[in-house]
Amino acid sequence: MKNSITTWKWSLGVMARSPAVLVVLAAVAALWGFGAYQWLWLPESSGLLLLLALIWAIAQFAVAIAFFAAISTASVGTATSDGRRIEFRSLLGFSRAQYWRALAWGAISMVVLLVLFYFFKWTDDHALEVASLLTFRSEKAVSPIRVGKVFWVIQMIIWIGGGGFLLSFLAHLLREGWTETRRQAARILRRCCWGASFWSGLLSVGVFGSLAWLLATWHPKVTVGSWDYTQMLLRMGAALVLVVSGWLFWSLSLARSIFQPDKPPTA
């Protein structure tokens, strides 16, 4: 636990010394979200527009993968060099071959996340049946709401563990390639299911994610007018910065716990 706290302090220190990087990453994420929002409103009135929507979706996916690869590369580079801040050039430190690996990782991750999403949706739909079965077996009333909360806790644990595994896998993949990463996949999974990697993800989601959710859902009472839109933009912007900060903190903590700083050569 002591090593985990040291890692978290280092990650927070790096982020505190890199405010410009955080703002740039948040701005890129905002532009990506704006593009995705515009894509959702594309009409489906012709085959040409459907083709445009397909190309647009592929471009959005490619940009998202570049975003994830940039954060992972910068995090690993900062961790291995024992850096005190994230340099802008490290965000573009991945090669074309590494980007193709990241694209393959993104496609596999999308399939895994979709399978988990629909599986959890199926379990949520059967919460009432589970509550009825438990009521029948225990002869005591079991609320489906309570069953749903238990399902939610289990799902969050799986989401955090799975997210840590995917981020760690990406970091290994970009640095070491497919062969070495596949060889270490079981060890990566064990580390992310329990240990420093899991707690880093829990801290990231619990602190940064909760603060972002509170800001995004907070509705202060203001007079209708320009200030109403201003406070909304400020809240959403701050929430987005917190989301990006949480992702960066998670990535930095994983990189620091996985890769040791490179030792300088001895004479």
Give residue ranges: language-model regions:
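Hydrophobic alpha-helical membrane segments
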Residues: 1-267
